[in-house]
């Protein structure tokens, strides 16, 4: 009898917890989004505090589609995942590559763009890029990224300069603190190579795709583990803005090619 009562009590307790959880489940009428403040043309913050860029427009389009009131929160790259899991915001829209390592810490939306990585150096400095060509050279790459892992695993005879932000790859390169940069092909083309600072530079070697959307990678929006209702809403909204042309209009505002990659 004691066992039966205990089992019944446990069942009632479990049902109570489940009911409470359902009652407390967020409806996502308000969403806080972590974004980066210095990664043009994907995101940047003006002196007046207003954000702009591809990621920003995509985030706003997702919010409009699901009829949510969204607040953008500026966050340094290295603190993105810790801040997400500390509930500083509810999701990250910051050109974050989907990797197996990151999927241990967060859930991701479907990929919303997918572009290769590129080598950037002084024009004409390298006919090809490989471990032999870069032996003894200093490679600049953003830390805590698939690109950093790729460089550290495949260019062991090169010196590696790890920087905090993607924008710092080309900034450090232009300042003469490295021989070659490894970063976003699109960011290099759309921003740095069109700037006065990038006039003497060019993409060199062959672009490399690291775990693209076809392999379950690409770039996604990160959410806390278990926030399935938010992920479902975001994925549905992403499909909707792709189908209704909103995504294309945002894409064409910033880029000459389709970066959806799907």
Question: Where are the predicted features?
Answer:
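Ligand-binding clefts/hinges and TM-proximal coupling segments of bilobed small-molecule sensing domains
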Residues: 69, 146-160, 200-202, 233-262
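Ligand-binding cleft/hinge of the Venus flytrap
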Residues: 45-47, 59-67, 131, 135, ...
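Extracytoplasmic small-molecule ligand-binding "clamshell" domains
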Residues: 23-95, 104, 257
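Extended ligand-binding regions for polar small-molecule ligands
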Residues: 57-65, 125, 133, 137-138, ...
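A conserved helix-loop-strand patch within extracytoplasmic ligand-binding domains
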Residues: 68, 96-98, 102, 109-157
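Short helix-initiation/N-cap motifs at beta->coil->alpha
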Residues: 56-57, 71-82, 126-127, 161-177, ...
